[in-house]
Amino acid sequence: MGAVEPSLAYAPLRRLPAQHRSMVRVQRMLDACAELLDEGGYSELSTTRIAERAGVAIGSVYQFFPDKKAITQALGLRYLDQFTARVAERLAEGGREHWTHSADVIIDEYLDMHRTVPGFRSLHFGDVVDERLLDSDTENNRVIATRLRQLLTAHGGAHECEQLDRAVVVAVEAADAVLKLAFRLDPDGDPRLIEETKLLLRTYLGHHFG
């Protein structure tokens, strides 16, 4: 029995891979999906192309996933887990004057994934496919805000409260809007707008909690 990747437990799989070799096949499908997204975007993606790139039979794809959207959802959840783990590790290192400065860490890790993780620059957390790709009951940015709030309280030194919940939602929405503009102006993210995003978050969060 192979260990199931945590993100797959929440993905719309027809069934979870029960053996190590099945898990490896599913991982290859997700890797193939990431590569193809970078090459042609979601509109050019298909289960047939994913199967060909992953080196598996099309029947193997449908054994686990009903369609290409389900595969991108699993990939988006994988990205969310990776992002969460990276931010948690950085926050655990400490060294910040105040937890509101964690905004820099969050933005830096997001940018590094955009530049280095296959498929992330094309999918990010799923809005290009569906604004509720990560969770059919919740908007993607809300899912991200919940994760970040948990990180800030567990590792960053913030205290759980209703005001924090609202502030993190606003911060995520604001950062998302400015970063999308930064990527429209420069494929790697306009450096000036990235710095403005960090300043915006530090100032906003500092106003409420500094």
Residue ranges of predicted features:
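Alpha-helical DNA-contacting segments of helix-turn-helix folds
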Residues: 72-79, 86-87, 140
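Hydrophobic/aromatic-rich alpha-helical bundle segments in the mid-to-C-terminal region
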Residues: 122-126, 134, 154-201
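An amphipathic alpha-helix signature
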Residues: 100, 104, 108, 142-149, ...
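Generic hydrophobic, amphipathic alpha-helix propensity
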Residues: 25-33, 50, 75-83
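Hydrophobic alpha-helical bundle segments that form small-molecule/ligand-binding pockets
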Residues: 96, 116-123, 131-134, 142-168, ...
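Hydrophobic alpha-helical connector segments
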Residues: 74, 88-115
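Helix-turn-helix
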Residues: 28, 36, 40-70
